[in-house]
Amino acid sequence: MLPELSAIQAEMQQQGLRRLLVLSGDHNWCHQQAHELQQEFMGDWLWISYRKEKAVLPEKAAGLLGQEYLHGVFDATEGLNAEALAILAGTLKAGSWLVMMVPSWHQWNDQPDRDSIRWNEQSGAIPTPNFIQHIQRQIANDRQVLLWRQNDPFYIPELPQYREWQLPDGQPTAHQHTILARLLRANQGVWVIIAPRGRGKSTLAGMLIQQWQGHCWLTAPAKATTEVVRCYSSEKGQFWAVDNLLKYCRQNSVSDIDWLLIDEAAAIPTPQLFELISYFPRILLTTTVQGYEGTGRGFLHKFCAEIPGCHILNLTEPMRWAESDPLENWLEEALLFDDAVPANHSAKAIGYHVYQQQQWIQQPELLKQFYGILTSAHYKTSPLDLRRLLDAKGMQFVAALGNNTLIGALWMVEEGGLSAELAHEIWAGRRRPRGNLVAQSLAAHSGLPQAAVLKSQRISRVAVQVNRRRQGIAQGMIAFQRERAEEQGMDFISVSFGYTAELWALWQKCGFQLVRIGTHLEASSGCYTAMAIFPLSQQGIALCVQAQQQLARDAYWLESQIGFSLPVDDQADQRLNQNDWQELAGFAFAHRPLSASLPALQRLLLNCGLPLTALRNHLQREMSIEQCVTELRLNGHKALTLLWRQETAQALVSLDEKLAMYWQEWTTVFSEANRLHHPICH
């Protein structure tokens, strides 16, 4: 076995190729074969594994971006983290083996996958038969993948020959030289270099900094990923963390800076990108729009398309390995990185179809189209979404088809149906089980525990082919699914999104009602989280009415935090009502967070004459947490929160001792005694 692999290894070095070798069997056997390969072939042999000592854990693999290694081992015997697999492949140099250890071939389907704990809505690891069948098919169908199964003869197929490959000498390629010349002549504008991994976009950015006769700054989601840029720039350009750069630009002139280079731009929230490009005369953004950071072609359609005169440049020729690299080709097929969707210009009637997860495996072309549309529309789509799509529990899928071609995709997630006892604990801040994003959030943050008991479906993703947008297709899919959800006995359907006036107008057009706005910016979108629902049952309508009334009542205090007006009618009445007492009791006697209780606490301060120094310092005098801790000589944030809760309890007792005692008991546990006034029961 080893002499044959040695001959293949020598050819890989000469031809600039990387290959996948799959070891399938029990863990000890796989580990032994991988160890023998490591002894035979000199190299870095980076391991990603849950089990091997000193290996990189799959969830820590992102820290490897921007680095290079010779040979790697990916241990998938306990679970297959698809992003980590792609990241490891992206770090491997020409001539590398990627050795993937997997369970016994015929038992792999039935084995619980540890990675499913990350993305399945339910607790505990589950088998993932659909994804495993998909991966097994890709391994078996690719004649350039070597598969060695325990207790079976190791058959090495005849491999095609490639011409000899020359390692880049550090000078720009002809294509890089052409782009670099254009950039060096630029007077102003936004330039975007788009390329898959290994094409030299970071190298090109570094060359621009090195050759530019002026000042260049560099930013990226993480400094570690800019190692190549800084290497080729001779460390000339100053690096800034995104948040620090924005803070500096808001307070200082940057007119003497000629270029801002933004590496891995698609991983930065678009509002931050739009603000950054407003400060500098020349901007260069480099990014990949296919791959493991969850950066799809939505970056082109949603960001680049909104910039007048944006110059989009592409690098296609690989620099770190040869053209038609077997490992890259296999990975693109296995993780569906090629998101090209067949164009459909037909104006014929559109039909809506429901699909089950098993059909993705039975019709792989359908899977490719459905996932491709999601990737083209959402530039945060990643291999984790592919795993959810294939095997996560409680998923429903609708597709819009025109002329037998898929032109729209809708992905729903089942939520709610929790017990009254668990919903009460979620409301009280004592429990936060996995899943149920909107249903739990309405209970935990909006004070609506009944939302977690009612049955609902959440829109996880909705996407339409680029050339068929603004034709009512998304609206049609949602209306189709809304009817299905009503037939299935759902109480409401929901959606969570980063709030912008434009996005809210879209959901409002689909009939949704705004029920919640968060007060912390989302890392992914740079916007505040908004939640909206479309009620389907009488209980759903009652929930919607109560949620809207509460949002309108809290709007004044929420708007002061988020800095813009909400599309609701503010209520001027600041007297305490029953909902306020319930909320304040949850803060004083349970574990509801300050952010959820803040509007009720502000009303409490207006209606109570007690000093309540800790609360007033933070909420009325707007002292920071650090200032409050120092002023009151407390031992940190936890001590301050405890004091806030004690002051709230003191205020409630001072207003009505009997009522305060009732609500204290009410918060303790859901029981027959508190059913009368419990929103879960109404």
UniProtKB/Swiss-Prot annotation:
Sample GO molecular function, one term: tRNA N4-acetyltransferase activity
Catalysed conversion reaction: cytidine(34) in elongator tRNA(Met) + acetyl-CoA + ATP + H2O = N(4)-acetylcytidine(34) in elongator tRNA(Met) + ADP + phosphate + CoA + H(+)
Transmembrane annotation, as ranges: none
Residues involved in ATP binding: Q176, G198, R199, G200, K201, S202, T203, L204, A205, G206, M207, R320
EC number: 2.3.1.193
InterPro entries in alphabetical order: Acyl_CoA_acyltransferase, GNAT_dom, NAT10/TcmA_helicase, P-loop_NTPase, TmcA/NAT10/Kre33, TmcA_C_sf, TmcA_N, TmcA_tRNA_bind
Binding residue positions for acetyl-CoA: V462, A463, V464, E502
Keywords: Acyltransferase, ATP-binding, Cytoplasm, Nucleotide-binding, RNA-binding, Transferase, tRNA processing, tRNA-binding
PANTHER family (alphabetical): N-ACETYLTRANSFERASE 10, RNA CYTIDINE ACETYLTRANSFERASE
Family: Belongs to the RNA cytidine acetyltransferase family. TmcA subfamily.
Name of the featured protein: tRNA(Met) cytidine acetyltransferase TmcA
Gene from which this protein is expressed: tmcA
